[in-house]
């Protein structure tokens, strides 16, 4: 339970708090973290790379410099946890995803093109994950809203996390350049 008073509002939270673990502390992570804070997530950002971690400055978030897979294991993720990997570095993203997909997290996702996502799934099959565990991975991460800029991509990511959190069934058909298309390896969710 958490009790807080900011001089105007008395707030008491019962039960587990929703948390978002972001793998990577780059520009996109800043927007994702800020929006997640606005949605009242406890945000933990993990990046062992000094060039990113040293410049992290989002108030109200926790920064971890440990290896992402170690953090995911240490946090003992539960059904109120979401993990999103956005580094574009398989050495960081894949190891964290490997651990997150074995957890009861309600959402696990990774940034990347459809082709990169397909390649990631093939890499994960080489480890001790079942196909059903790998099918829990949301990738490319985010709803297909035509996002191009980091803030738009963050909106897309948090929209998908919110939909999954609320049990909304997501369609694999979306719009690209105003035309309805099916998801395949040649289309991407965002321009990253």
PLM regions: where:
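Short, solvent-exposed amphipathic alpha-helical segments in soluble enzyme
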Residues: 35-40, 99-102, 125-127
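Extended hydrophobic-aromatic, low-complexity segments
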Residues: 74, 93-96, 109-110
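Segments forming oxygen-rich coordination pockets for charged ligands
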Residues: 1-48, 52-64, 73, 78-81, ...
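ADP-ribose/adenylate-binding Rossmann-like module
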Residues: 82-87, 98-123
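A general structural motif
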Residues: 63-70, 75, 87-91, 127
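Short amphipathic alpha-helical segments
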Residues: 33-35, 57-58, 95-98, 121-123
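Adenosine-phosphate binding glycine-rich loop
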Residues: 111-192
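Residue-level detector of alpha-helix initiation sites
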Residues: 26-27, 90-91, 115
């Amino acid at each position: 339970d958490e009790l807080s008073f900011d001089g105007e509002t008395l707030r008491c939270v019962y039960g587990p708090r929703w948390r978002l673990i972001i793998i990577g502390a780059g520009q996109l992570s800043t927007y994702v973290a800020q929006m997640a804070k606005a949605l009242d997530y406890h945000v933990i950002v993990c990046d062992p790379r000094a060039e990113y971690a040293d410049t992290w400055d989002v108030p109200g978030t926790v920064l971890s410099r440990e290896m992402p897979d170690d953090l995911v294991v240490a946090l003992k993720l539960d059904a109120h946890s979401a993990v999103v990997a956005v580094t574009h570095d398989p050495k960081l993203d894949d190891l964290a995803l490997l651990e997150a997909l074995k957890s009861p997290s309600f959402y696990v996702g990774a940034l990347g093109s459809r082709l990169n996502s397909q390649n990631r799934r093939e890499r994960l099959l080489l480890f001790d994950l079942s196909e059903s565990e790998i099918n829990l991975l949301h990738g490319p991460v985010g709803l297909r809203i035509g996002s191009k800029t980091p803030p738009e991509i963050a909106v897309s990511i948090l929209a998908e996390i919110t939909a999954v959190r609320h049990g909304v069934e997501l369609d694999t058909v979306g719009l690209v350049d105003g035309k309805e298309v099916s998801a395949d390896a040649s289309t991407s969710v965002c321009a990253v």
